Amino acid sequence: MVLNNKTALWFMTLVLLLLSSREMVPGAEARLCRVRGTRGHCFNDHGCDKVCTREGFVRGKCNGILRRCICDRQC
C-alpha cells in the first residue's frame, strides 16, 4: 500500500493533534485535608500560610468568623 503525500500529511497532522491534546489534560491532583494549625488565631492569610508551610503543611489560610488558622495537608 503506497500513501501519497496528501494522505501522509493528513495522517501526521492527526497524530500530532492527538498527541498535543493529550499533553493539555491536567493530571490528577492529590486530595487535601484541612486541619487546625497550631498557631490558633490569625489576622491574614499570608502569615497563616507561612506558619503552616513551616510546620510541613502544603498551605494555610485564615478561615471563619473567629479567624482560625487552617492548614492543608495531603491525605
Swiss-Prot record:
Protein name: Defensin-like protein
Keywords: Antimicrobial, Disulfide bond, Fungicide, Plant defense, Secreted, Signal
Signal peptide: 1-30
Disulfide-linked positions: 33-75, 42-62, 48-69, 52-71
Species, as recorded: Gymnadenia conopsea (Fragrant orchid)
Subcellular location: Secreted
Keyword set includes Secreted: yes
Membership in a protein family: Belongs to the DEFL family.
This protein's GO CC annotations: extracellular region
SUPFAM superfamilies assigned: Scorpion toxin-like
Listed Pfam families: Gamma-thionin (PF00304)
Highest taxon, organism lineage: Eukaryota
Gene Ontology biological process terms, A to Z: defense response to fungus; killing of cells of another organism
SMART domains in alphabetical order: Knot1
Keyword Cell inner membrane included in the entry's annotation: no
